[in-house]
Structure formats: structure tokens, C-alpha cells
Design a protein with these regions (language model features):
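Metal-cofactor-binding active-site regions of metalloenzymes
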Residues: 2-213
Length: 213
């Protein structure tokens, strides 16, 4: 077993090591800042699957996210499901934010209001820089499927959306590909040409570092 001092030294070295966030699904910062934040904001992405597995119904999920309902009512409805999922990796990530970013020991009856207020307070321009660059020491983020959205900070890179060229099984997808390439599709040859134009556009973009299917 490593000594306490060795553990501390290793943790300090890890904290000071710049990292690459190799898989992100972050929206552009501007629209994110327009969205009201509260305790449930931390659980709306990957944790949703765990909540459903813990027994949350469609009605529960809708109520958790319904800002027209009193915050306390939403918390009381959410609380038993948090108890069921809190040891899972996704919930632990959310609770790390509560502890290390927001400064609360845990998300509880006595802190859900404060956590909600603090999440809203920090939801201001520069949020990504403060959390990703300054707090997490991230040198680059690789964003999935958001190539034509933005703007993003200059340390964001992109995985191009592979379905644009491989998932063209219906008319809507064909029309979308045609519009993006400004090239009509009336034959298989036209489709292949649009696929090639799309891939060439990705290859020419220095912010594109790969393709995600």
C-alpha cells in the first residue's frame, strides 16, 4: 500500500498534469447560459438511464425537469431515486461537482436549494474556461457531432457526425446531405459525390480530428 505522502504526491502530480477530454457532448456555451440551472441539471444526461433503471417513470422524469413546479416538490420526488443511484459512476460524477466545484459536502435535504442557487450563480460567460481549463486543467476537448454548431472555445476540437454520410436511408437524410453540399441528389453517383464532398470538407477543417458514427 502506498504511504499517505506518496498518495498525496501522486494526486498533486495528476492535478498538475494537463489532460485531453477525449469525448464531450457539450452544447455551445451561449445557449447553455440561457438555460436555468438547479440541482437536477447535474442528472439530466447520462444519469437519466440510471434513474429509469431505478424505477423513475416518464411522469417522474418530466416532473424532475419541470421548472414550473416548486423546487422543494421536485427535490422530494427526486430524492428516493438519488438514494438508489448515488453509488453509480454517473451519479458520483454529479456529486463530485456538488463537492469540488460548488463546495457542498453532499446533495441533501439541507443543501439542494444552495446547490441550485450556486449552479445558477456560476452559469455566466466564461463558464467553460473556468471549469474546463482552470479547474480541470484540460488542454483540449474533443466534441462529438457539433461541428456546425458553436461558437466553441479555441481548445475545442470535433468528431465529425458520421451519420451524415452513412445513415442516409430516408428522404430527409438525403435532402439534408444535398443542402449541406449544395449538390442535387438524383442518382447513386450523386449520393457518392455528396459523401465525398462532405468528407473532403471535414478533412480540410483543422478542428476536425476524427469521425464519430
Amino acid at each position: 500500500m502506498p504511504s499517505d505522502s506518496l498518495t498525496a504526491d501522486l494526486l498533486e502530480e495528476l492535478v498538475n498534469t494537463r489532460t485531453v477530454d477525449a469525448h464531450e457532448h457539450l452544447p455551445p456555451e451561449a445557449p447553455r447560459l440561457d438555460t436555468k440551472r438547479d440541482f437536477y441539471s447535474l442528472f439530466q444526461h447520462y444519469c437519466s438511464g440510471d434513474l429509469v433503471a431505478a424505477g423513475a417513470t416518464d411522469e417522474d422524469m418530466a416532473a424532475f425537469a419541470d421548472h414550473s413546479l416548486p423546487l422543494a416538490d421536485r427535490w422530494l420526488r427526486f430524492r428516493p431515486f438519488l438514494s438508489a443511484i448515488r453509488t453509480g459512476a454517473y451519479a458520483q460524477s454529479a456529486l463530485i461537482v456538488v463537492r469540488d466545484i460548488l463546495g457542498f459536502a453532499d446533495l441533501t435535504d439541507s443543501t439542494f436549494e444552495g446547490v441550485s442557487e450556486e449552479l445558477q450563480r456560476i452559469n455566466t460567460p466564461g463558464l467553460y474556461d473556468r471549469i474546463l481549463k482552470e479547474r480541470c486543467n484540460i488542454a483540449a476537448c474533443v466534441e462529438c457531432w457539433c461541428l456546425d454548431q458553436g461558437p466553441y472555445p479555441d481548445y475545442f476540437y470535433h468528431l465529425a457526425p458520421g451519420p451524415e454520410v452513412v445513415d442516409v436511408a430516408h428522404r430527409g437524410a438525403l435532402d439534408h446531405l444535398s443542402r449541406k453540399t449544395d449538390h442535387a441528389i438524383h442518382s447513386l453517383g450523386d449520393l457518392l459525390e455528396c459523401m465525398s464532398l462532405t468528407v473532403d470538407r471535414w478533412r480540410a477543417n483543422p478542428r476536425v480530428v476524427g469521425v464519430k458514427s
